[in-house]
């Protein structure tokens, strides 16, 4: 996958790429009302269990984007999607806390804009 767009986490001894795609952005928008509301929702989770559920949902969503891309490109060798139950069973609450930085990095990479400057314009002549 493209390292400029993804970050890697280890879940249960297996590496998973987290990637923010347009599809993931739409799902986040449905759940939180937009990317801007995501941080507020995570910080204002009413209880510890709810906060864990939100992080697990996000990890599953972002990790499955890379799997879905793989499956699209390799129809002859599809990989199984990660489930929220898988993430719950293969992680500890401490792992989930550590994954927050990776989630943030994946979100940043997914929304990063590369601005390229052009050379001097042909129309900038000295008069």
Where are the regions a protein language model picked out?
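Residue-level signal for threonine
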Residues: 21
């Amino acid at each position: 996958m493209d390292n400029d767009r993804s970050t890697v986490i280890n879940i249960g001894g297996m590496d998973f790429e987290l990637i923010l795609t347009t599809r993931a952005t739409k799902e986040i928008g449905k759940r939180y009302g937009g990317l801007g509301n995501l941080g507020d929702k995570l910080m204002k989770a009413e209880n510890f269990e709810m906060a864990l559920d939100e992080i697990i949902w996000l990890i599953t969503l972002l990790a499955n984007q890379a799997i879905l891309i793989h499956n699209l490109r390799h129809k002859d060798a599809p990989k199984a999607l990660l489930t929220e139950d898988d993430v719950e069973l293969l992680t500890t609450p401490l792992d989930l806390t550590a994954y927050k930085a990776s989630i943030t990095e994946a979100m940043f990479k997914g929304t990063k804009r590369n601005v390229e400057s052009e050379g001097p314009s042909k129309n900038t002549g000295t008069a």
